[in-house]
């Protein structure tokens, strides 16, 4: 990646951590990403730089978010779980290139968010990244495509079976 950001190391990690005993919400399909190699691959593969707006779907406890903030011009994290909102806001409070939106990705107006943020921050490209809940991966991807939002790439983690279905030839039974 080679991009050293002005934001590196500005984290309030003490009170911005997921509390001990935090239970993932099965109803939300939560599976937090914490493998640094995978995180690095996502950031590198997304070709993010300081002219990039990143929209992160489902930031969870912010492991990927940390690297996105370091690489991007601006990061908007969209998180549904109200238990994680104060954790994310605390963890990244020292960053002027981050905001979290407490909303369901399937209900948010992604085109307006992208258009307004690109204009407000003078950014030239948009990347969408995320670790998607398995049971709503297809609806999320469909919504993003149908939204007409301007984004150059979509880099997501998904369950292998979902990826196989998306990549399958029409009419193939999986």
Residue ranges and their predicted role:
Residues 1-174:
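Catalytic cores of RNA-modifying enzymes
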């Amino acid at each position: 990646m080679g991009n050293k950001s002005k934001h590196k190391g500005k984290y309030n990690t003490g009170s911005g951590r997921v509390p001990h005993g935090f239970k993932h919400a099965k109803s939300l399909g939560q599976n937090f990403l914490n493998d640094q190699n995978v995180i690095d691959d996502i950031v590198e593969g997304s070709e993010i730089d300081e002219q990039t707006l990143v929209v992160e779907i489902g930031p969870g406890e912010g492991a990927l978010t940390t690297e996105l903030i370091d690489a991007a011009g601006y990061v908007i994290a969209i998180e549904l779980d109200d238990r994680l909102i104060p954790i994310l806001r605390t963890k990244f409070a020292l960053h002027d290139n981050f905001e979290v939106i407490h909303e369901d990705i399937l209900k948010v107006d992604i085109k307006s968010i992208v258009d307004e943020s690109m204009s407000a921050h003078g950014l030239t490209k948009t990347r969408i990244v995320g670790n998607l809940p398995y049971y709503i991966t297809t609806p999320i991807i469909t919504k993003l495509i149908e939204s007409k939002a301007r984004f150059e790439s979509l880099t997501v983690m998904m369950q292998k079976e979902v990826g196989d279905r998306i990549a399958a030839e029409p009419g193939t039974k999986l």
